[in-house]
A protein has these predicted regions:
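Catalytic cores of nucleotide-sugar-dependent glycosyltransferases that transfer UDP/GDP/TDP-activated
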Residues: 1-388
Length: 388
């Protein structure tokens, strides 16, 4: 390497941290890293070759089993679709198309360049244009789960969620009565109409509840009020992802930590990703990369790049199958942003237009891949190295 790590450490005023790390590596009995990427960095910057590369793992007991994947996905997906219905329907002149749809997500720390959020959103913008031009009857909803500075919650959105919940509760109260009316109509072979199922007072009450729905000038891009110069809003504008009614790809910026009591999705992170169809992680730099691994463990397809330690390990061990890989590894090493965006767009289009049966096969392959990274298995690497 032509780098002078010590000089750079002083230039960036991190000499104390650097010297501690360098000497820790120098005098350690066993020196390891989690990936080939960090092993190369260690040799260049800390001047010691690693004794072994020990990949990171996860506790698979926290994730659904093969048998549970379909049931939990359906449950969590339906909760997400319900949120999407409440979020978008006040602004659409046609019915909100949530049933014939796919749920994608991006997540991670707010490192827009490193995490690849920029190329991901630009590729999604291209996908939006392609789906519109080809008039493909599918809708993509993309959540951006990235904690960020907020001004306030979007009160209109929150009030609408409360209103729709009120309507749902009212219909629950009427359920037995509506069931009885429907049953009588069927038994007596009478024509079924709205008037037969709901009386005038009930219709008026429903109209009263719906009258509380609030609208803004355009469909919101986020669950929260953000600063006007927010970097994600700038990227949405650049990518043409503005949540117009005709858009096939719509975005929901979710700038808070997911929680079962956050007031919007009311799901924790693992539940939210389990209810999705695809996680998108086109990182520019990732020593390991837990987010795609967690996504696979949840039984969900993922996209990552060859600049992550996780993808490097998968390729080195030849764990992928060509037909249903479960995860797609985009070439990002020595590639321009334009080349990355093009390949990512092609992969997104391929996944979007998959048959349902093929998506299901990829889901199970994703979960199978994750089984290689259970700590129950990987801990043996540490024990063997220690005993040697």
């Amino acid at each position: 390497s032509t780098l002078d790590p010590l000089k750079l450490a002083y230039d960036f005023h991190i000499e104390a941290k650097y010297l501690v790390e360098k000497n820790s590596a120098k005098f350690a009995d066993i020196f390891t890293t989690v990936s080939n990427i960090t092993a190369f960095e260690a040799e260049c910057l800390l001047k010691r070759k690693v004794d072994a590369v020990l990949p990171n793992g996860i506790d698979l007991s926290k994730f659904p089993t093969f048998e549970e994947i379909a049931t939990q996905h359906r449950k969590n997906r339906n909760l997400i679709l319900e949120f999407l219905l409440y979020f978008f329907s006040p602004y659409l002149t046609r019915s909100c198309p949530v049933r014939n749809s796919l749920i994608f997500f991006l997540s991670g720390r707010k490192e827009i360049r490193n995490k690849g959020f920029d190329v991901a959103l630009l590729a999604l913008g291209k996908l939006n244009q392609i789906l519109k031009e080809k008039n493909i009857n599918i809708n993509i909803y993309v959540f951006i789960f990235v904690p960020d500075e907020i001004i306030d919650i979007n009160h209109n959105t929150m009030d609408n969620l409360i209103t729709y919940k009120g309507l749902e509760n009212y219909l629950d109260e009427l359920r037995d009565e509506i069931k009885s009316r429907l049953l009588h109509s069927l038994i007596h072979q009478r024509p079924i109409s709205g008037e037969k199922l709901l009386n005038q007072d009930e219709i008026l009450e429903i109209q009263k509840i719906l009258g509380k729905i609030k609208k803004e000038k355009q469909i919101p891009l986020s669950t929260h009020i953000m600063k006007s110069d927010n970097e994600f809003f700038q990227l949405f504008n650049q990518a043409g992802l503005l949540n117009k009614e005709e858009d096939k790809v719509k975005v929901i910026f979710y700038p808070i930590y997911l929680s079962s009591t956050d007031g919007f999705l009311n799901l924790n992170y693992y539940e939210a990703i389990n209810g999705s169809h695809l996680g998108i992680f086109p990182s520019l730099y990732e020593p390991w990369g837990y987010t795609p691994l967690e996504t696979l463990a949840a039984g969900v397809m993922a996209i990552t790049t060859d600049l992550t330690g996780f993808a490097s390990y998968i390729e080195e061990k030849k764990l992928l199958t060509k037909e249903t890989p479960g995860i797609w590894i985009i070439k990002r090493k020595n590639k321009s942003d334009e080349e990355v965006i093009q390949e990512l767009t092609e992969v997104l289009f391929k996944i979007t237009t998959m048959e349902r049966s093929e998506r299901i096969q990829n889901k199970y392959e994703a979960r199978r891949l994750a089984s290689h990274f259970d700590w129950k298995e990987l801990v043996k690497n540490y024990i063997n190295l220690y005993e040697s």
